[in-house]
Design a protein with these regions (language model features):
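Boundary/activation segment at the start of structured domains
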Residues: 1-106
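Caspase-like (clan CD) cysteine peptidase catalytic core
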Residues: 16, 71-157
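Short, intrinsically disordered, charge-balanced linker/junction segments flanking boundaries
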Residues: 160-166
């Protein structure tokens, strides 16, 4: 376990922790407006995570994926990383979130088609399954997109009734 100390505060990053920061700012389908802030959000999150005073993640444990073309490539990369992570696993997404015709959350990639989000985007269910199946002690997802609240409903539905307070 790595510990950083500065200004009297200890920041502890569990061994074998990984963060995946996904930002999608450009789209092939004209129905999606570009989100220039998505790229900047990934850069800001990386700076926050790797700051030794704030979070202290080693830079080699923070992976940026900016403007991925295919959802399958993102999903495969997430699975590969999740399988070897036993510390903390953080997945951050900034981009468009859209709903399928059955109200399932889909995270867009550059090639996502507005009228076919479930088969051209990255479904939240896929990301949730990656998180559930990981042996990481801490699993965290941060979604900066429309319809992010659907992720809570999907987890609640798949894990049974839960008490959410706040």
């Amino acid at each position: 376990m790595e510990t950083f100390q500065e200004s009297g505060a200890d920041v502890v990053v569990p061994d074998d922790s990984h963060a995946v920061l996904i930002g999608v700012s450009a789209y092939e389908d004209a129905e999606f407006r570009p989100i220039r802030a998505a790229r900047r959000s990934v850069e800001a999150m990386r700076a926050l995570l790797t700051d030794p005073v704030l979070c202290g993640w080693p830079p080699d444990r923070v992976t940026e994926i900016v403007n991925p073309s295919l959802a399958v490539d993102v999903a495969t990369g997430l699975v590969d990383l999740a399988e070897k992570t036993t510390g903390a696993l953080l997945v951050y997404y900034a981009g468009h979130g859209v709903l399928s015709p059955r109200a399932e959350l889909c995270l867009t990639v550059t090639s996502t088609r507005w009228n076919r989000p479930k088969i051209t985007g990255l479904t939240w269910e896929t990301v949730a399954e990656v998180l559930r199946s990981s042996s990481a002690r801490v699993r965290l997802a941060i979604l900066d997109c429309c319809f992010a609240g659907q992720a809570i409903e999907a987890l609640t539905d798949s894990c049974g009734p839960q008490n959410h307070s706040g």
